[in-house]
């Protein structure tokens, strides 16, 4: 399908404005990846996202790179970073130290996650005194913030001016890794909200009805926080299969087959852009407050999707630009 498919053009510029736009990036794991990573960030910044989340790595193994990446985003870019925090791979002391470090660096938003267990440790449980769930992690983050505010009046004022926000994960299709159904995940989200979660970002799904049904069920039981759909560009069948193996969320076979049948990556990119723009259009029609795009540190697939929706990069915008509202 051509990129000029008008049936799905520019929903963000109609009744849905203002919508939230955000990206997930993974910190570079070695020095040779630093330059391409920051080039990708710069390209993403040109479409004026509201925030950018930085992963922490399975088992917390990328924690030092994540901390350095988040600090640089705070210091050198106009973006509001969301710092991922996980229970797996971290003692309580390490989590507390990381929260203090992030808060001291100017971070005001966290994504509290249980995290993926290390390979071969699928039955992971926290050690004595460890943090075992996203709910416990929310409590810990807010406890650290309170201690800082109690100890320093200036921090209390800053907190009043820019309140701490904590995002959590939501699983519209259920969580195969935890063996939970969508209904059970709604109840889990309600518990996270009660613990102090500010908003939720969903795990992957491939049908807007999955998202819409989850949100409807969540609202019926009292979940009031925003639920932002998390979406992955469908341009690489091998990557989709790896993500399926990691998350347990089944990728529709027609999607994998269609991508595999295209002889060139250019055609797969075009198909993925149209598929992604249609999915975004559908979730916005269902009332989504915006979209969170999983980039895998590749700017082109997400920018292709956004271009179909009328979101164009600003060629003059740089990392040092001032924040501004998307037109």
Describe these PLM feature segments.
Residues 31-44, 66, 92-99, 180-191, ...:
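Short, acidic/polar
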Residues 3-11, 32, 129-152, 156-163, ...:
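Active-site pocket-lining/capping segments in soluble small-molecule metabolic enzymes
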Residues 51-62, 85, 111-113, 198-207, ...:
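Catalytic beta/alpha-barrel core
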Residues 2-51:
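Conserved N-terminal beta1-alpha1 strand-loop-helix module at the mouth
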Residues 24, 52, 102, 192, ...:
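Conserved, mostly hydrophobic/aromatic
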Residues 10, 32-34, 60-72, 91-97, ...:
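Active-site-adjacent beta->alpha loops and helix N-cap segments on the catalytic face
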Residues 16-20, 48-51, 77-81, 106-108, ...:
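Short, well-ordered coil/turn segments that N-cap beta-strands
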């Amino acid at each position: 399908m051509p990129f000029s498919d008008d049936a799905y053009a520019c929903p963000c510029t109609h009744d849905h404005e203002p919508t939230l736009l955000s990206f997930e990036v993974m910190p570079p794991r070695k020095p040779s990846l630093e330059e391409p990573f920051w080039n990708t960030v710069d390209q993403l910044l040109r479409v004026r996202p509201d925030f950018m989340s930085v992963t922490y790595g399975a088992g917390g193994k990328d924690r030092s790179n994540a901390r350095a990446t988040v600090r640089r985003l705070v210091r050198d870019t106009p973006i509001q970073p969301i710092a991922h925090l996980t229970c797996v791979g971290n003692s309580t002391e390490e989590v507390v130290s990381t929260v203090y470090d992030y808060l001291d660096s100017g971070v005001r938003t966290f994504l509290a996650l249980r995290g993926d267990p290390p390979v071969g440790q699928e039955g992971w449980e926290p050690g004595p005194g460890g943090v075992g769930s996203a709910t416990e992690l929310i409590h810990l983050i807010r406890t650290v913030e309170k201690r800082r505010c109690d100890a320093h009046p200036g921090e209390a004022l800053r907190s009043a001016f820019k309140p701490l926000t904590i995002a959590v994960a939501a699983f519209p299709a259920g969580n195969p890794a935890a063996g939970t159904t969508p209904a059970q995940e709604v109840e889990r989200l309600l518990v996270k909200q009660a613990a102090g979660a500010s908003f939720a970002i969903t795990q992957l799904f491939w049908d807007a009805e999955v998202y819409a049904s989850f949100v409807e069920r969540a609202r019926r039981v009292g979940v009031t926080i925003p639920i932002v759909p998390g979406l992955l560009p469908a341009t690489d069948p091998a990557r989709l299969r790896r993500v399926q193996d990691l998350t347990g969320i089944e990728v529709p076979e027609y999607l994998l087959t269609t991508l595999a049948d295209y002889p060139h990556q250019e055609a797969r990119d075009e198909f993925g852009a149209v598929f992604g723009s249609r999915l975004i259009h559908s979730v916005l029609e269902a009332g989504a407050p915006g979209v969170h795009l999983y980039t895998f540190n590749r700017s082109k697939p997400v920018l292709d999707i956004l271009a179909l929706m009328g979101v164009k990069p600003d060629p003059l915008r740089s990392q040092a630009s001032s924040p501004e509202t998307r037109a």
